[in-house]
Amino acid sequence: MPELRRDPVVGRWVIISTERSRRPSDFASAPVLPRNSGPCTFCPGQESRTPGEVLAVRIPGSAPNGPGWDLRVVPNKFPALRIEGELEPAGEGVYDRMNGIGAHEVIIETPDHGASLASLPETQVVAVLEAWRQRMLDLQKDARFEYVSVFKNHGEAAGASLEHPHSQLIATPIVPMMVEQELEGALRHFRMRKRCIWCDIIRQEMQGRARGLGRLILGEGGFVALCPYAPRFPFETWILPEGHRSSYEDALGTDRRALARVLGEVLRRMNQVLGAPAWNLSLHSAPLKTPTLDHFHWHLEIIPKLTQVAGFEWGTGFFINPTPPEEAARYLRAGVPTAT
């Protein structure tokens, strides 16, 4: 029997279509493999092909914007928003507009063209996580910006135009609608119960694990990875700090090391179970001007590209998920592919 489930944060309903239930081996897609060995725009020796770096982790003595780096952050050569100028908001009847002001940056995660977050050493993943944090803290100083979205597209099917390992961030003068919905839903829960909804979710999932019923994948070093109760997509996974933290920027050094371990392990298990799929990652953190909130809890969302969003989803807002999260979590806990 199919089941309708309601997301406890934003109130979105999804259809868990058990009659279409699919195992990992049913999601036939080409694994994400290097298409070429480089050199590409992001490879060492090609630094002149990118805008000047705004942050870099370098070998001592190496010159900026040249070889000798472990990580670089550069403005996007083809930005979605421009950093120069003022917002100048205006209206025309019911229509609102403002200038397309923002920041769009690329985090080049490693010199190794053929690597991935799943294969990088923990220390390098920590460097990536710290680069996200440093850039968020710097962009927070710009009074025009309300939010910084950090995201990663892994694989062509996930929207990656270049295969060299990289993530991106976009600072916007508006808090994104999806984050606004999370903020509003979390505030409703907090006003009723005086508790953070994500803290309650973590608590309930950890209790479920003790009974062998949960959607928890793993927990380590103060972080948990879980498949949410009402996932939009098969094998959708969240990573959250166990303790209440509303802003990613507040993450301590020990937090980033633990997060690097959990993130790397989740991605490796997805590769094992799902055959190295394409995926999207997004960071949800508190808005820049309200970094400390009792009702919001920062988290990562990882969505493997296993199904297509089609007419019903676009027309209704309902998502049809053929894999119950309990099954997805069970496969990811085992971390081994299921035979056909």
Please describe what each predicted stretch is.
Residues 249, 253-262:
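Gly/Ser/Thr-rich active-site loops/lids in small-molecule metabolic enzymes
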Residues 1-164, 170-246, 254, 267-272, ...:
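Active-site microenvironments that recognize anionic phosphate/pyrophosphate groups
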